[in-house]
């Protein structure tokens, strides 16, 4: 082998057996890469969490609207069941009550009751 070939082969042998030294700069780079990956996974996780929570929020808003509609219907039904004519009809039919005549009505003076 000639001298030039020996030098090239010797350099290749040295680079193959090269040991890596842990330097402060290498540690910083590895730490930054790990921080970058954690940050990326965090962004993905929280975006997904935000999306799922927003869908849940919309579902709850829809349920609230449906419950308000149902509540309005129940209020209307309650008003219907408690109308004066219905109460009077049930009092007459089921309880045998009747409206008093004008002679049967007694007015009580509230001022006289206090004294």
Swiss-Prot record:
Residues in the Cytoplasmic compartment per record: 1-25
Membrane-protein topology: Single-pass type II membrane protein
Subunit composition and interactions: Part of a complex composed of FtsB, FtsL and FtsQ.
Topological domain spans for side Periplasmic: 47-115
Spans through the membrane: 26-46
The protein, known as: Cell division protein FtsL
Family: Belongs to the FtsL family.
A GO biological-process term: FtsZ-dependent cytokinesis
UniProt entry keywords in alphabetical sequence: Cell cycle, Cell division, Cell inner membrane, Cell membrane, Membrane, Transmembrane, Transmembrane helix
Annotated gene: ftsL
Chief location category: membrane
GO CC terms of this entry: cell division site; plasma membrane
Organism from which the protein derives: Coxiella burnetii (strain RSA 493 / Nine Mile phase I)
Localisation: Cell inner membrane
PANTHER family linked to this entry: CELL DIVISION PROTEIN FTSL (PTHR37479:SF1)
Stated role: Essential cell division protein. May link together the upstream cell division proteins, which are predominantly cytoplasmic, with the downstream cell division proteins, which are predominantly periplasmic.
Species classification: Bacteria, Pseudomonadati, Pseudomonadota, Gammaproteobacteria, Legionellales
